[in-house]
Amino acid sequence: MSARHPVIAVTGSSGAGTTTTSLAFRKIFAQLNLRAAEVEGDSFHRYTRPEMDMAIRKARDSGKHISYFGPEANDFGLLEQTFIEYGKSGKGQSRKYLHTYDEAVPWNQVPGTFTPWQPLPEPTDVLFYEGLHGGVVTPQHDVARHVDLLVGVVPIVNLEWIQKLTRDMSERGHSREAVMDSVVRSMEDYINFLTPQFSRTHINFQRVPTVDTSNRSEERRVGK
């Protein structure tokens, strides 16, 4: 942790509401005239979308599984090193994972690819992370140890899955079958790597659904 170069992380699952929480932080930064360097959790994925599809097929053929919640599909070491480097020097690198055509076209790329790594802006007052693994701990890596303020957006599973289904189908062009396969395939990693983070957070938020979420596989509008 660093007093000169603090790290703030908002962590939660896909569809949990981390984007809404992050928007609130950005408004706070603006009101306090703080300049934040931002890194996205998706930028630490190991694979492009075609590479991930191939990795999923290989894992399935060998009776194993791989998901974006687990270490096989993410570079926890690089994430940890990013937090360490920023805490020491206020420097680091970032890139983006391009989910949609709208995101990809300005880069002259296709969805499911990464932008090149680029230096973080300087100088900045804080590093802000939003993603799946801001508080992850494994036998090899302790990302949570390097975060000064760790905020969790904890699971409300049915609401979370409905929002993920709606977003991935309407905004990212995935089929219902592909989204539900992703949810089912991710369960072991979800339990082992995502949910333990919420015992390490400094603050947790938990949303309360105000719509019918009884059928978690039903696409419906539930807000952001």
Please annotate each region the language model reported.
Residues T21-S22, R26:
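Post-Walker A alpha-helix
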Residues L34-E40, F44-V105:
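Conserved nucleotide-sensing/catalytic segment adjacent to the nucleotide-binding pocket
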Residues M1-H5:
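Phosphate-binding P-loop
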Residues I8-T11:
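Short hydrophobic/aromatic beta-strand immediately N-terminal to the Walker A/P-loop
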Residues T113-E122, V126-Y129, V143-R145, V157-K224:
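C-terminal accessory "lid"/substrate-recognition subdomains
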Residues S14:
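The conserved Walker
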Residues T18:
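Conserved lysine of the Walker
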Residues V136-H141:
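Conserved ATPase-coupling elements of RecA-like P-loop NTPase cores
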